[in-house]
């Protein structure tokens, strides 16, 4: 058990170190300017950014609680908050592979079977994706003319990214809620090579999808849960999209209004959600600079990106490490008690 905890510390430390090194390499040309810009950021501004970052995770926990209450009404907001931060920890330290197992294990300890736990987390993921699409669509309808007039070249690529992101969200939603789409995917699995290795993978992937579809449908097809979940998600996204605006202002960019940053941020999340990433890093940073550099020079946009990721990535990860270690300690106590 001690070796397992040591590995946890090592993985957490290495993850942060690698990300820090990557940031240094990416921004090495403008690093002096970034340091200069960040040195002028007031302390209250940093605190407000961190508060918004925590508020986003708290709203994510409210969404989780809405879904959990459908299965287990006695679960509390603190339970949902722990599930959320365990997800943050698993996504970063295990490159996403351990996210669902960590969250499902916690829910299992709270009295939910493994299938229900997986269904809850899958439902939360789908509701989040649906809300991202709704928010981006409304923002684009309201601000599309401004985007076309102020950045026509960029708008063309953003529209393509929007369409691709929308198609992925729709396909994902149908996969979890419509049996015909699930049957189609399972049929495609049968086209994979007929070898022992691929047969094992096909069986594993197919059974996982069937289980997720079965459990997620129990939640997603309940109107009250669906409506409340999307409402909470939209409010959560409003908080998230407010962080780039504050980061840009603190870095010295005043060319964009609050509504314009909301539009660009909503498109940024929709597009990057459809792209592969490593531990939540890569596409988001690229998209942030691509979208906001036209209205701020590279150094200011890069400084704003650092502030944004501190609030939405590093700070939540730090909190998630604390939550994980506390939950691991409780698990070890329970294991020792059973052994005795």
Describe the predicted segments one by one.
Residues 59-85, 89, 247-264:
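Membrane-embedded helical hairpins/re-entrant loop segments and their flanking transmembrane helices
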Residues 216-267, 275:
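Transmembrane helical segments that form the transport core of multi-pass membrane transport proteins
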Residues 46-50, 77, 81-82, 118, ...:
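Hydrophobic alpha-helical transmembrane segments
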Residues 32-38, 208-221:
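A short amphipathic helical element positioned immediately N-terminal to and/or at the very start
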Residues 5-6, 42-44, 73-82, 113-114, ...:
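Membrane-helix interface segments
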Residues 6-10, 40-48, 217-231:
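Membrane-interface helix starts
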Residues 49-56, 87-91, 128, 232-236, ...:
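Alpha-helical transmembrane segments of multi-pass integral membrane proteins
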Residues 1-36, 87-199, 277, 281-340:
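Transmembrane helix-loop-helix hairpins in multi-pass inner-membrane proteins
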């Amino acid at each position: 058990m001690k070796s397992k905890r040591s590995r946890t510390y090592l993985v957490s430390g290495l993850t942060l170190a690698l990300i820090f090194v990557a940031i240094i390499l990416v921004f090495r040309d403008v690093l002096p300017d970034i340091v200069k810009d960040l040195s002028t950021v007031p302390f209250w501004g940093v605190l407000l950014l961190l508060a918004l970052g925590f508020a986003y995770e708290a709203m994510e926990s409210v969404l989780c609680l809405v879904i959990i209450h459908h299965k287990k009404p006695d679960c509390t907001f603190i339970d949902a908050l722990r599930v959320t931060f365990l997800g943050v920890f698993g996504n970063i330290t295990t490159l996403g592979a351990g996210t669902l197992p960590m969250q499902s294990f916690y829910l299992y300890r709270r009295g939910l079977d493994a299938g229900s736990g997986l269904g809850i987390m899958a439902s939360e993921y789908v509701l989040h994706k649906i809300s991202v699409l709704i928010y981006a669509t409304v923002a684009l309808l309201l601000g599309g003319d401004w985007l076309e007039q102020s950045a026509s070249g960029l708008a063309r690529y953003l529209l393509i990214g929007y369409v691709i992101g929308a198609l992925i969200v729709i396909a994902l939603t149908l996969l979890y809620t419509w049996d015909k789409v699930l049957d189609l995917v399972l049929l495609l699995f049968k086209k994979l090579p007929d070898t022992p290795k691929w047969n094992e993978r096909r069986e594993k992937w197919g059974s996982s999808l069937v289980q997720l579809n079965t459990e997620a449908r129990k939640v997603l097809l309940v109107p009250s849960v669906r409506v409340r979940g999307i409402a909470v998600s939209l409010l959560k996204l409003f908080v998230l999209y407010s962080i780039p605006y504050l980061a840009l202002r603190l870095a010295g960019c005043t060319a964009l209004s609050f509504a314009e940053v909301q539009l660009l941020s909503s498109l940024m999340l929709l597009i990057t959600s459809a792209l592969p990433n490593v531990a939540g890093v890569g596409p988001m940073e690229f998209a942030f600079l691509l979208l906001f550099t036209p209205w701020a020079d590279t150094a200011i946009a890069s400084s704003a990106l650092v502030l944004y990721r501190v609030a939405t990535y590093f700070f939540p990860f730090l909190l998630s490490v604390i939550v994980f270690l506390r939950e691991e300690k409780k698990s070890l106590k329970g294991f020792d008690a059973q052994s005795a």
